[in-house]
């Protein structure tokens, strides 16, 4: 599985990408919305994890571009946000996001959601 992880929080992206790589996931990390769109065009991933609030345009703007481009429109997009406003979830799903997760999220739970999205078997995760 190849995942494009787009979030301006470098500590979070390092944490998530390290955890995903430990599970054998190829992870490409970018830190702004425009980089996310350009990276997906250059080398389409299996799934995109996109933060709502980033520099270089919002994650919502990137999601719109991703869904309008013939090259990226069918790639599943999972959106992360620290916002608990129900409107955020409704907006991103209306724009084509397949899933919406509230931060904080860890690599194990993200991996489980990614496997579900891509219909891959998920290993059992031990409770913490």
Regions found by a protein language model. Give the residues of each.
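Acidic catalytic/metal-coordinating carboxylates
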Residues: 32-35, 58-64
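Alpha4 helix (beta4-alpha4-beta5 surface) of REC/receiver domains from two-component response regulators
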Residues: 61, 84-101, 109-112, 116, ...
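Short hydrophobic/Thr-rich beta-strand motif most characteristic of the beta2 strand and flanking loop
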Residues: 24-31, 39
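Charged docking surfaces used in two-component/phosphorelay signaling
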Residues: 14-22
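Residue-level signal for the "D+5" position in two-component response regulator receiver
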Residues: 29, 56-57, 94
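Active-site beta3 strand of CheY-like receiver
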Residues: 43-49
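Active-site residues of response regulator receiver
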Residues: 51, 81
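The feature encodes the CheY-like receiver
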Residues: 13, 55-56, 73, 85, ...
């Amino acid at each position: 599985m190849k995942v494009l992880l787009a979030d301006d929080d470098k500590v979070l992206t390092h944490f998530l990408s390290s955890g995903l790589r430990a599970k054998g996931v190829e992870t490409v990390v970018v830190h702004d919305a425009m980089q996310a769109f350009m990276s997906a065009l250059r080398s389409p991933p299996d799934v995109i994890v996109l933060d709502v609030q980033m520099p270089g345009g919002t994650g919502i703007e990137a999601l719109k571009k991703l869904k309008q481009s013939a090259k990226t429109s069918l790639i599943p997009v999972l959106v992360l946000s620290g916002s608990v406003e129900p409107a955020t979830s409704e907006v991103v799903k209306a724009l084509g996001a397949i899933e919406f997760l509230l931060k904080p999220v860890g690599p194990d739970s993200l991996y489980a959601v990614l496997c579900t999205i891509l219909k891959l078997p998920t290993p059992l995760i031990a409770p913490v």
